[in-house]
Curated annotation (Swiss-Prot):
The protein's name: Phosphoribosylformylglycinamidine cyclo-ligase
Enzyme Commission number: 6.3.3.1
One annotated Gene Ontology cellular component of this protein: cytosol
GO terms, molecular function: ATP binding; phosphoribosylamine-glycine ligase activity; phosphoribosylformylglycinamidine cyclo-ligase activity
Keywords carried by this UniProt record: ATP-binding, Cytoplasm, Ligase, Nucleotide-binding, Purine biosynthesis
Domain of life: Bacteria
Length: 347
């Protein structure tokens, strides 16, 4: 340099003061998620967490996820308050299907230019998701990276660790022909299929804020946060013998249900057992999407599927309904012939 100008990190696009302001803004909501096992608070180089003493042979279960291009829709509509709930839901729902109780959560927030209000709104949503699932928000990383993201665009990722008793891991190995499948209703598309959602909005020239479905805007339907099933599922596991649980995320019915089925087993789904929520019917019609593609891309109103002995199915529906879930018998497990599909959806 020839002009002897003294440059700062802020001149390069990184505002340390804004980052510190964000930490101060979120301390209160983060504290509300605290669990007794957590040692220390925000600000350490690492977060410390003891294992709950009730576990005899504790097995740690971990998962990481994002919210896909639902985030792009949220940014376009300038609605950042619930995307954090989505982030937590995508992680903790993946843990609980194996019988695990979520313990702690960490987030990663990356942006080109840190907007403290936006980031605080997102992290407040993360804290809300942690409260809903009973896990502690123990830390995170806020990365301001000029040149990597356009303007104040941002991305988020989450990481969660849970614990399950070794003898109580749910891995699908007990699934047998005759088991009944119980569905748990979804709150909407959750956090999957949004690249197709956005394509449909584009080709149909639809403004989601000016389109109404069943008394609320299409934008509200599409940004409805992913349902967190942790407390309902953990309660169910304590009371009934559960053979398998599938979280219907990317890949829909066709790819997620087989993940928990042993070889030689087939899930036979009764499509007449439920009605698609209006948002899915709208997406199918507006995008001229085939039935097969709908079930491969979206949850179509089913957030989770539980497999359990037939004699327990009615009780499961009763318990889940009492927990506030919409639950119903959606199908059965059958023996599959060699080479047969592992999921059959009968109209």
């Amino acid at each position: 340099m020839t002009n002897k100008t003294s440059l700062s990190y802020k001149d390069a696009g990184v505002d340390i003061d804004a980052g510190n302001d964000l930490v101060d803004r979120i301390k209160g909501v983060v504290k509300q998620t605290r669990r007794p096992e957590v040692m220390g608070g925000l600000g350490g180089f690492g977060a410390l967490c003891a294992l709950p003493q009730k576990y005899r042979e504790p097995i740690l279960v971990s998962g990481t996820d994002g919210v896909g291009t639902k985030l792009r829709l949220a940014m376009d509509l300038k609605r950042h308050d619930t995307i954090g709930i989505d982030l937590v839901a995508m992680c903790v729902n993946d843990l609980v299907v194996q019988g695990a109780e979520p313990l702690f959560f960490l987030d990663y927030f990356a942006t080109g230019k840190l907007d403290v209000d936006t980031a605080a709104s997102v992290i407040t949503g993360i804290a809300e998701g942690c409260k809903q699932s009973g896990c502690a928000l123990v830390g995170g990383e806020t990365a301001e990276m000029p040149g990597m993201y356009h303007g104040d665009d941002y991305d988020v990722a989450g990481f969660c660790v849970g614990v399950v008793e070794k003898s109580e891991i749910i891995d699908g190995s007990k699934v047998t022909p005759g088991d009944v499948l119980v569905a748990l209703g979804a709150s909407g598309p959750h956090s999957n299929g949004y690249s197709l959602v956005r394509k449909i909005l584009d080709v149909s020239n639809t403004n989601p804020e000016q389109t109404s479905l069943e008394g609320k805007s299409l934008a509200d339907h599409l940004l409805e946060p992913t349902k967190i099933y942790v407390k309902s599922i953990l309660s169910l596991i304590e009371q009934l013998d559960i053979h398998a649980i599938a979280h219907l995320t990317g890949g829909g019915f066709w790819e997620n249900i087989p993940r928990v089925l042993p070889q030689g087993m087939q899930a036979v789904i009764d499509e007449a057992s439920w009605q698609w929520p209006a948002v899915f019917s709208w997406l199918q019609q507006a995008g001229n999407v085939s039935r097969h593609e709908m079930y491969r891309t979206f949850n179509c109103g089913v957030g989770m599927v539980v497999a359990l002995p037939a004699e327990l199915a009615d009780k499961a529906v009763e318990l889940l309904t009492a927990s506030g879930e919409k639950a119903w018998k959606i199908g059965v497990i059958a023996a599959a012939t060699e080479g047969a599909e592992q999921v059959i959806i009968n109209p």
